[in-house]
Amino acid sequence: MSSPLPSERRIFTDPETGARVTQWTSSPALDRPLYFTSPSVTRDDRWLVFLSERDGGSPNFFAIERASGLIHRLTNNTQGSLASYCYPSENRSGIGKSSPCLDPDRNILYYIKGYEFWRVSLDGDRVPQKLATLPAGWWTAFTHVSADGRWLCVPCTHPDAFLPGQSTQWEQLDTVYPLLKDKGLVSRIYLIETATGRSRILAELPFWVTHVNFAPDDSDKLLVNSEGPQSSRHGSPPRIWCVESDGSHHPLFEQNGMRVNHENFARDQPWIIYHGGYEKNGEARRRNFVAARDWTGSPIFEYALEDLPLMHATPMNNPRWSVVDTPEHIAMICPDAQNRSALIPLCRHHSREGFGANQDHHCHPLQTLAGGGVVFASNREGEANVYEVHL
């Protein structure tokens, strides 16, 4: 176990809202929290896990001891970034930047390196252990661990769906699904038993799966997406899908005529939260909303936001509330008794113009499980760093 790095913590007050904000990292390299489908902070509020390229550009994982700010190294990758969703390249080694998921109740981080699944305990000796081997050459994406800690899920997509020479996520979005469709290729949904490392294929789906989520109350229910063009889904599969324990699958609801994104289970309810926009004069980004449905597709709520653009909307501990990033703010959406949405700015994120083009610079705001803050990324200082606005 190596000695920790010194704290980089800085606390300041947002001049617009008066909120207290902690800047947790300040290296000149990329530092960002985990993707919004995984918490970055453990439930006991002791650790904050982040990805950093402070080691000469190769991504590695670190854990901040929140009481002291000390930074503990979790991995020692020197082989760059594995080619995967959001990160196209020709590299078939290194850490998958889209792969980490944190088990927040057992303080274990899971991640992919090369074509292997690894884990490292935040509370133990912090020595990574190999758990399972994945199919060589298949492209991975965001992963998830079940609430009971027994299962990992990882989507793996046939390598022939990925064109050489691409450099951005946006190129992938335009080409991967058409190639899957034209060539009859699939994404496989793998389940890995955390106790043994044994794996099995739960389902083979004829579209590009990049997000997976176990239901919080039932690890036999899996929420997945169909990734594709960033417009309404005419001519392509619906965005949000439900996968049962026998591998059967069905769309959550009919999704034509709207743009839906960033589906996620509520934290302690089997509700599926998502956001999007209805078409308005041919523009799918208009008439925006945040909504929830149950596993059968029945609506629970929908809050209209009119023309307010959202990058992401993630459920808070109150499942009817969401934390969002607008072009200027980290904010909460809190409905009143008549289901009218109220947007409450928490702080300005000051991410620079054009940050949406770089996945690593997306804010990806997520409330901590203990409830006291919202962790997000901001590139206000040039590269992304890890911040938290306190509630």
Region roles according to the model:
Residues 48-49, 109, 149-152, 221-223, ...:
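Hydrophobic beta-strand positions that form the internal "hydrophobic ladder"
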Residues 1-22, 181-188:
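Blade/loop signatures of beta-propeller domains
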Residues 261-291, 297-342:
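Loop/turn-rich, solvent-exposed surfaces of beta-rich toroidal or solenoidal domains
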Residues 34-38, 83-89, 94-101, 138-144, ...:
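Repeated scaffold domains used in trafficking and secretory/extracellular systems
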